C-alpha cells in the first residue's frame, strides 16, 4: 500500500490576514504592528531620525535594497547607461476598400488555358478488335550443366604497410571447406607460467572453522512475539478467519484472495466485524501451539489517526483462532519381542559357599536326572535361593577335572543344545555281549567320588605317627 502524503497548505501572509481581519477587528497585535509599521524597531528608527539624518541609506525594516535609488558609492555618482532600442523598418499598410475581394490568391493568373486530354472517338461499329495467339511448345527449362569443368581460384596480395608483423600468414579472403573455425598461426614463443596448486582441507583435526569469522554458539531463529504487551489480543471464533480473512475487514468479495501473504486494505469507515475496524494491513499467518492447542494467528495494523505529514498511527492487534486441541500422549505397554528362555536344571551353577543344608537330597536328585554326554560333566541346581541375603555368594561350576566349563564373573550360562544326527549302522547289531576281564584293577566313575551318600571317615595322623580312626 502506497501512502499518499497530504498536501500542506501554505499559511496566509500577514498582509492577507490584515485585509480580512481588520474589518472584523479580530487581527492579532503582531499582524497590525507589522503592517502599519508600529513595531518596536520602527519606533526606534522614528525617534532616532529626529536628530540624525538617515535619508537615502535605506535603513529600515524593509528589504536591504538601498532605497529607491539604490546604494551610491562615496566617491561620486554611478555611471548611467542609456539603453537604445533598435530601429525597426516601417511596415507598409495598404488600404483595403469595401469593393476589394476578400479572397487572396496565392498564384498569379495566366493567359494560357489548356483544354486537357482529348476524348477518343470510335468510327467503326464492330468495337475493339481482339487478337489471340496459341503456342504448342511446352515451357521447359534446360537445367543440364554445360560441358566443361568449373575452376575456383583465389588470389591474395600481401601489403607490408597494413600487415601485423606478428602474423606470418595473412588470412585468406575465403575458404572452401566444411570447417567453420579458421585459425591464424602467429610467430614467436608463447610463454606460460606454472602455478603450483595446493589442496585444501587435507591436514587438520576437522574442527577448524569453515568461515573466517564463525558465529559462536547456536543461532536460533526468533519466533513471532505475539503475546507481548504491545499487541492487543483478540480471539476470533469464526473459522472463516482462516480461509477468508478479508470478509472481516471489507464488504468486497474478490474472486481470488491469497491466504498465505500479507493483505493490505484501504481505510474504511465501516467494517463487517467491529473488531477489525480501521485495519489497513493483515500480516501473513502463523501456526503456533499454545497451551495444548493448535492456534492460527495474524497480526493486524490499525490506522486510527493520520498526521498532516501522512503518518499512520494505530495499535497492533493479534487475532487468533484455535483450530483444535492437542490430546495427551497415551502410554502403551511394550511387550518383549523375544520369548523367554526355559531354565534347565542341568545348566545351572552350584554355590559351594551357601549355608549348610541337606545336600544329600539335592545330590541324589541330580544324580538320577543326570544325562551323560561326550563332555563327561554334570551340573546340579543352585542352592543360592535358600542362602541368606547378608552373604555375597560366589558360584563356581562342578565338573570333571579335565573338562571344566569356565565362567568368569556374574555371567549367566544359557542352555545350549547340539543337534543329534540319526546314526544308521552298516551291519546288524548283535545284542549279545561277552564280558571279558583282563585284570583285577578297575576304576569307578569320577562322578561317584563327588556323589557319596555317607560321609567318609578320614584318618587323622598325629605327631607320633599313630593313626586314629
UniProtKB/Swiss-Prot annotation:
One of its GO terms (cellular component) is host cell Golgi apparatus. It comes from the Viruses. Keywords: Capsid protein, Cytoplasmic inwards viral transport, Disulfide bond, DNA-binding, Host endosome, Host Golgi apparatus, Host nucleus, Host-virus interaction, Late protein, Microtubular inwards viral transport, Phosphoprotein, Viral penetration into host nucleus, Virion, Virus entry into host cell. Its main location: virion. GO terms for molecular function: DNA binding; structural molecule activity. Coiled coil: none annotated. Disulfide bonds join 21-27. InterPro entries: Late_L2. A motif (Nuclear localization signal) lies at residues 1-12, 450-458. It is found in: Virion; Host nucleus; Host early endosome; Host Golgi apparatus. Highly phosphorylated. It holds the Pfam family Late_protein_L2. GO terms for biological process: microtubule-dependent intracellular transport of viral material towards nucleus; symbiont entry into host cell; viral penetration into host nucleus. Belongs to the papillomaviridae L2 protein family. Minor protein of the capsid that localizes along the inner surface of the virion, within the central cavities beneath the L1 pentamers. Plays a role in capsid stabilization through interaction with the major capsid protein L1. Once the virion enters the host cell, L2 escorts the genomic DNA into the nucleus by promoting escape from the endosomal compartments and traffic through the host Golgi network. Interacts with major capsid protein L1. Interacts with E2; this interaction inhibits E2 transcriptional activity but not the DNA replication function E2. Interacts with host GADD45GIP1. Interacts with host HSPA8; this interaction is required for L2 nuclear translocation. Interacts with host importins KPNB2 and KPNB3. Forms a complex with importin alpha2-beta1 heterodimers via interaction with the importin alpha2 adapter. Interacts with host DYNLT1; this interaction is essential for virus intracellular transport during entry. HAMAP family: PPV_L2. This is Minor capsid protein L2. The gene is L2.
